[in-house]
Regions:
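Residue(s) in the substrate-gating loop at a strand-loop-helix junction
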Residues: 144
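Active-site helix of classical SDR
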Residues: 124, 160, 168
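Substrate-binding pocket helix/loop in short-chain dehydrogenase/reductase
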Residues: 100-101, 108-113, 195, 206
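Conserved glycine-rich cofactor-binding loop
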Residues: 8, 15-17
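Short, small/polar-rich loop/turn modules that mediate ligand/substrate recognition or access, typified
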Residues: 176, 181, 236-238, 244
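Conserved glycine-rich Rossmann-like NAD(P)H-binding loop of the short-chain dehydrogenase/reductase
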Residues: 29-46
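Alpha-helical segment proximal to the catalytic Tyr-Lys
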Residues: 129, 173-177, 234
């Protein structure tokens, strides 16, 4: 299927992990993709382009800091110049700086809020003018089950991801009349290169606590993004799609 044929998407934080999976899934579904990277080496982004360049669509990487308001404006203008339009925005860039509150520094709190939450304001604000002009657009924000229920040792991360949920619902209400949709995805325990660094018994403990008895995959999240980005979800906005194997059932 080519569920995203002819559409152009921006994916922030698209050079590794979940972001890379989203880029690949969008390409497979016929989308042109502009993806950003910031904390990773340019070689990683270039390797991703080389892997996907023969799929018959356009793909390009941009080194850009989503936490920088002006940089986001520059990015959107550059993507418009390079691709001729924007139809989908996936706000995926994010970091963790976990610690108990008593040990968490102000800098670590501020950094996580800036990268995880303010970046979504920055990018949505920058792309809004494009979507309003064409009276169509699709925004997908990457939250987390931690933003739904909290987690000890992640007060900064939980606050940022919970903020995304409120932002998503508000933007859906503001822009729905202009045919602009905004939804969020809340992944649960997803097995990536980050979780591969954890002790095997820790990973197994997570798996055992999940009703489906496994961790999620990058593909699980990417497939959900394809659904929300496509016309198959054209009557869905302001929603939070939890991809968590049943971790949260209430």
């Amino acid at each position: 299927m080519n569920l995203l044929q002819g559409k152009t998407a921006i994916v922030t934080g698209g050079s590794r992990g979940i972001g890379s999976g989203i880029v690949k899934a969008f390409i497979e579904q016929g989308a042109n993709v502009a993806f950003t990277f910031y904390g990773t080496a340019p070689e990683e982004a270039e390797a991703e382009i080389q892997e996907l360049k023969d799929k018959g669509v356009k793909i390009k990487s941009y080194q850009s800091n989503a936490a920088d308001f002006e940089a986001c404006e520059v990015l959107v203008n550059q993507v418009l110049e390079d691709f001729g339009g924007i139809d989908i925005l996936v706000n995926n860039a994010g970091i963790t700086k976990d610690n108990l509150l008593m040990r968490m520094s102000e800098a670590d709190f501020d950094k996580v809020i800036a990268v995880n939450l303010k970046s979504i304001f920055n990018m949505t604000k920058a792309v809004q003018k494009v979507f309003l002009k064409q009276r169509s657009g699709n925004i997908i924000n990457m939250s987390s089950v931690v933003g739904v229920q909290g987690n000890a040792g992640q007060a900064n991360y939980a606050a940022s991801k919970a903020g995304i949920l409120g932002f998503t619902k508000s933007i859906a209400l503001e822009l729905g009349s202009r045919n602009i949709r905004c939804n969020a995805i809340a992944p649960g325990f997803i097995e990536t290169e980050m979780t591969a660094k954890l002790a095997p018994e820790v990973v197994q403990g997570w798996r055992d606590s999940i009703p489906l008895k496994r961790g999620g995959t990058v593909e699980d999240i990417a497939n959900a993004c394809v659904f929300l980005a496509s016309d198959m979800s054209s009557y869905i906005t302001g929603q939070v799609l939890r991809i968590d194997g049943g971790m949260i059932t209430a």
